[in-house]
Design a protein with these regions (language model features):
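Phosphate/nucleotide-binding beta-alpha loop and adjacent structural elements of enzyme active sites
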Residues: 2-260
Length: 260
């Protein structure tokens, strides 16, 4: 298996070199329609490599994180909400195939048993929020991926799907407290944020001067908070990229990464 994984990584790196891919800004990408097409094809090609050990992300977020980080091994991720850590996971492949470590956070009880079983990293069951130590109502819904804090259950197009739910109280932890609790490095390779509505509240309270992220993916579900998140990230030195691929996520990299 190790030999096959090494071969896969070498093939990816060779293809990237031959295609001379540079992610660039969204504006630059739009001027290069052919390049956009080739990048999209490359993502699809990468998914076919190494048999069943493919992307677990819904929109190839794991492949994006690997590309930005030059397919490094031993990177560091932070992902919330993590669900069961395997299906529709943005970090499963990073951990299992590339030896990354990191933190997963998931307050929905329905996922906890399998999350512990499926992953070998730090797992936090408190709910990530703008403040630590609050006790808030949380709606765990039948479609588990849509579970969220009760105050956000009616905030997007999935409000009707959240009507069948179990509500219970969760303790909260801020993002900065989460990172410090698990001694996260000051430079984190990938941050994945999918909390069904509370993303802006969480990131607005975060001190971006304390930690740097090589890439960030944030679910927005086309709510009014999408552009507010973009403004917040831009004010803190990040730029949005690959809008044509990211669907109801937005993907960000540091402005300083000019070669991407």
């Amino acid at each position: 298996m190790k030999k096959n994984e090494d071969s896969m990584k070498q093939k990816i790196k060779r293809i990237l070199g031959e295609m001379n891919i540079f992610l660039g800004s969204v504006e630059a990408q739009r001027r290069k329609d052919g390049l956009i097409l080739e990048i999209d094809k490359l993502f699809d090609f990468i998914l076919t490599l190494n048999g069943g050990e493919n992307s677990r992300s819904q929109f190839k977020q794991d492949i994006f994180a690997l590309m930005v980080n030059k397919f490094k091994e031993g990177g560091y991720f932070v992902e919330f909400g993590a669900t069961n850590g395997c299906d529709i996971s943005n970090t499963y492949v990073l951990e299992k195939q590339f030896g990354w470590r990191g933190i997963l956070a998931e307050p929905a009880k329905m996922w906890h048993k399998n999350l512990i079983k499926n992953r070998d990293c730090n797992v936090e069951f408190d709910c990530v929020w703008h403040t630590s130590g609050e006790l808030l109502d949380f709606d765990m819904v039948k479609e588990g991926e849509l579970s969220t804090l009760s105050i956000f259950s009616n905030s997007d197009e999935y409000a009707k799907a959240r009507q069948e739910k179990t509500t219970y109280v969760v303790n909260t932890i801020s993002l900065i407290a989460l990172l410090k609790k698990y001694n996260a490095p000051k430079e984190i390779d990938y941050l994945s944020v999918d909390t069904e509505g509370s993303e802006l509240d969480i990131l607005s309270a975060f001190d971006f001067n304390e930690y740097r992220f090589n890439c960030i993916t944030i679910e927005h579900n086309f709510t009014e908070n999408r552009e507010k998140l973009k403004f917040l990230l831009e004010q803190n030195g990040y730029k949005r990229v690959f809008e044509h691929l990211s669907k109801w996520d937005d993907w960000y990299i540091p402005e300083s990464l000019d070669s991407y």
